[in-house]
Structures are given as C-alpha cells and as structure tokens.
Amino acid sequence: MDAFRDAILQRAPIETFALKTVQHFIQPQKQTKLAQDENQMLENMLRTLLQELVAAAAQSGEQIMQYGQLIDDDDDDDDIHGQIPHLLDVVLYLCEKEHVEGGMIFQLLEDLTEMSTMKNCKDVFGYIESKQDILGKQELFARGKLVMLRTCNQLLRRLSKANDVVFCGRILMFLAHFFPLSERSAVNIKGVFNTSNETKYEKDPPKGISVDFNFYKTFWSLQEYFCNPASLTSASTKWQKFSSSLAVVLNTFDAQPLSEEEGEANSLEEEAATFNIKYLTSSKLMGLELKDSSFRRHILLQCLIMFDYLRAPGKNDKDLPSETMKEELKSCEDRVKKLLEITPPKGKEFLRAVEHILEREKNWVWWKRDGCPPFEKQPIDKKSPNAGQKKRRQRWRLGNKELSQLWRWADQNPNALTDSQRVRTPDIADYWKPLAEDMDPSAGIEDEYHHKNNRVYCWKGLRFTARQDLEGFSRFTEMGIEGVVPVELLPPEVRSKYQAKPNEKAKRAKKEETKGGSHETEGNQIGVSNSEAEAEGGRGDAETMESDAIADTPTPEEQQRLGGSDTENGQEAGQIEDGETEEAGLMDTDLDHPPMPVS
C-alpha cells in the first residue's frame, strides 16, 4: 500500500511508474499481466486505500476530489489534481493496458460514490464524464457495464427529483451515450407502467367559486386511465366509464373551439418558452386551461397514445380489445384527430407529425417483441498504406497465376501421364458391373438401394457408354438405364429381357438404310439443281453428234455398188450407227429425266 501512496504523489507521467508500482506490490511478480488471485489481492488493497483517502478528506473538511492536491509548477494555470483522481488515473491506465482486470476501475468508482455526499458525488460524476471515451472502450465496457449501471441507478435513487433535476439529467444523458441503443436494460421489456405517478386533483368543490365541478372531476379522472391503459382491457366496465368520460370532454372541446388569435397567443414556438412537467390541477385554472391550445393538445395526444397502445401489434389474444371496443376506439380516434386538426396554430401539420411518429413507433414495438436484437455495426478499420511505399506487382511466368501453377505442376510431375495408378476412364463393363449385380434377383437387393437411383452414377455411365458402345447407348430410350448395361454382364434370368431380338436388329438395320437412302436422295436433288446449266450444254453436243452420224451413213445405191464384199463393213457401220443412236438417245433421256435411285 505504501508503494501506491508514493505513486499517487509523483508528478511524472503515469506510464513511467504505474506498472513498476504493481510489480513492486506483488513480489516477485515480473509479468505484465496479473493472475486472477493477484488481481483480487490488488483490488482489495486499492479499495482499502481509497476508503482511507476519503476518510482523511472528510476529516480535513476538503472536497474529496481535491484532497491532497498536487500543484504543477510548470503550468501557468496551476493545474490542481487531488490524490483520489490521481489514483483513479493510475488504475484506469492499468486497466486500459490490460495489466490488471478491466472491471477494477468500475468497482472503485462505485465505492467512491457510495462513500461520498451528494455534493461530492457531482465532482465524482464529473470525473466519470471526462473519462467516458476510455471507459466506453469495448475491453473495459464488457467488464464493467453492469457495475456502472448499478452505480448510476443508486445515484438516481439518492437524488431529489425536484431539487436535483439537472444532475439527474446528466446521469441519464451519460447512460444514453455509454450504453448502446439496443441495451435491454433501458427499453422496459415488460412494458411496466409508472402507476406511482398519480395526478392529484380536488375531490370536494371549492367554496365561493362558480365552477362546473362535475366536469372538473370527469376531466381529471381520465389521467387514472392514461397512467395505466392496461386496466381498460381487464374489465369492460372500466372501458365504458372511460369512454363516457372522454365523450364529455370531447363535447366540451367541440363546444368551445379556439380561434387563431387565441392559438397564436398561447403558442410555445418561442425558443425561450417552457412548460410544466406536471399538470396544474387547481379548479380555479380550469377555465384558463380550456382556452390554452397547448393544454388541449397534451390531452388529445394522450388519447392517441393510449389508443395506439390498445391496438399495439404483437399482443396476445387475451390482451386484444373486443370487436365492440375496436369500433368505439375507431370512432373516438377519428374524433380526436379532427379536434387536433382544428386546434391552432398549424393543426394539420401537428396532426401529420403525430401520425408519423406513432407509425414509426410500431417498429420500436416489434423490436421489443423480438427480444431487442442488436443492430449496431462496428466501423471498418481503414488500413492506410505506408506512405511512399509502392506495392510491387507480382509477375507470372505464363501470364496469370493458374497457367503458371499448371506449368509448374507438369514440371513437378513428369510421370503423371504414364503412371499406372493415375485416374483413367473406366471400361463400361467394369463401370456397369455394380448395376448388373443389383439386377440379379438372387442377390435380394431392394430397389431403393439400387445404383440406378444414383443420378450421378447413371449420368457418368451414359457418358462412358456414348463414347464406347453406341449400340448399348441406343437402348436407353427403349429400356431405360438398365438396358444400357452390357448383355454379357446381366444374370441369365434377366438377360433375355434386355437382349435385342434378330427381327429387331433387322428392323433397326432397315431403318438405318432408309435413313441413308433418304440422305442420298437429298444429295441427288441438290446435284440436279446445281447441274441444270451443264445439262443444257450437253443436249447441244448430243444433237451435233447425231447430225454427223446421219451424214456419214451410205445411201442404198452406194451399198449395192459396194456389194457383198463390204457387208461385214456395212454391218459394223450399222452397229456403230445403232450404238451411236442409242447412246445419243440415252444421253437425251439422262439429260431430260435423271434416273431415280432405287431404295
């Protein structure tokens, strides 16, 4: 403890002596991070030291945050820093650097607020506000958020709601900034109403003042239902009483409309304008309040908020209003909105803003119904590149990374294509063997376990068969996947079922020939269309050859003069002529009518 007493009196920077002080206290500790039992021992010592410092400050009559103040002579402003804040700074530095347990600083702050008076608590809380950024870091917040919440709640209980309004507001603002938006402890998960906030009003009529006291009691009795709207759905009599009282108030507002001049006179649009947080319920003010446009808006807005609660989404069936109650709610809501619209100043704009807020409120209600899931996103760390350092561009041997890896793999595996253990395309007989075994009735394999139900297996098998056995692949359309299996692999009992019959083979061959003939016909038709011009030229040559043959034929007188010695020559000439004639005729026939192929 003496080591820390001396440490808080030093003027040197905290980082130069904080860790050494801890290591000196826990001997022979030389590590930069304490163990669990060492943390507990250090925390107990610090709490004892803090208690002694607070007691000494109380005896001296000084404020605890200024007790044992240190004056920095080097600073012109005479920076005053007491021993207790200096001790808290040392512990906060150790927690931030993770030399000690992160929740230690929060425990010391809780002890300090409990030992301080309300006047000193303001100074302590001022120190907490100044260290809000450090205390809110994730490594510290996770360890001490519950302790800090308990500390602030204890302060709020000790403060007076009437005299310490500003200090209460500071605490609430700190909690709003310190905790995330999705913190469950601040959203009233169960929807509990503050029924202790009662609006008190006069029960007996005053003497000597002419006031419609029945209307006065009816008007302020509505606050009992606004304070606890859930009571309206528990009993139908309460809803009937509330609806009748509300109808009286709305009728009065209708009977006493406000003019634009009255609305402008009572407007709270000025920057310095204020209003009371509690209603003034004196019966003497009833007439003036009815002429106040802001007062009317407060009452009508309370009605809309309560109606919105009664119809809130996500409620249980037992908490929902009845059908009759829903109709009355609708009529009352329409009437309230109409009164808000005609209430000056700018009634339509005010009503539109209220409707927008109530619509957005449904998102909040659903979020609470879903258990308040967190919706904050951590900021992305922006890593700035080193200034002046340019990243070297990587070069690849073959243009890109994949090609270079493939080339290196080929160099590193020279026997990849000749290795006997390499992956090969299987033979269809080996591939279809498991399916053939499934088709054996004697094996007793159930259908749901057959390989034919494996779509990947069948797809691969069809690809292999299409490359190696086209005839077997053609059986797929008629017999299914089992027909693709080679016949020699099938068991004898089912082989006849999937074996192709001779007549079927003949039909298949004839069908293939027919397909081949049709292809030839199409080729001939294309050939005819391409050789029409050549046919015309061929016909002219044939006519020329025929005229030459007639000119060379001898007359009858010449045949008699030649006599029998030339018979053989004449016969040969006649045969030649006949052959030439037939040849010319065939040529004409071929050119005019090309022969049709015989199927």
Swiss-Prot record:
Its main location: nucleus. This is THO complex subunit 1. Pfam families: efThoc1 (PF11957). It is found in: Nucleus. Residues 376-395, 497-599 are annotated as: Disordered. It comes from Arabidopsis thaliana (Mouse-ear cress). Keywords: mRNA processing, mRNA splicing, mRNA transport, Nucleus, Plant defense, RNA-binding, RNA-mediated gene silencing, Transport. Residues 575-585 have a biased composition (Acidic residues). Component of the THO complex, which is composed of THO1, THO2, THO3, THO5, THO6 and THO7. GO terms for cellular component: nucleus; THO complex. One of its GO terms (molecular function) is RNA binding. The keyword Nucleus applies. PANTHER family: HPR1 (PTHR13265:SF0), THO COMPLEX SUBUNIT 1 (PTHR13265). Acts as a component of the THO subcomplex of the TREX complex which is thought to couple mRNA transcription, processing and nuclear export. Contributes to the integrity of the endogenous trans-acting small interfering RNA (ta-siRNA) pathway. May process or transport a long RNA molecule so that it can be a template for secondary siRNA production. May participate in the trafficking of siRNA precursors to the ARGONAUTE catalytic center. Required for the generation of functional messenger ribonucleoproteins (mRNPs). Plays an important roles in plant innate immunity. The keyword Translocase does not apply. GO terms for biological process: defense response to fungus; ethylene-activated signaling pathway; mRNA export from nucleus; mRNA processing; regulatory ncRNA-mediated gene silencing; RNA splicing; ta-siRNA processing. Residues 502-522 have a biased composition (Basic and acidic residues). Disruption phenotype: Developmental defects as well as reduced levels of endogenous trans-acting small interfering RNA (ta-siRNA).
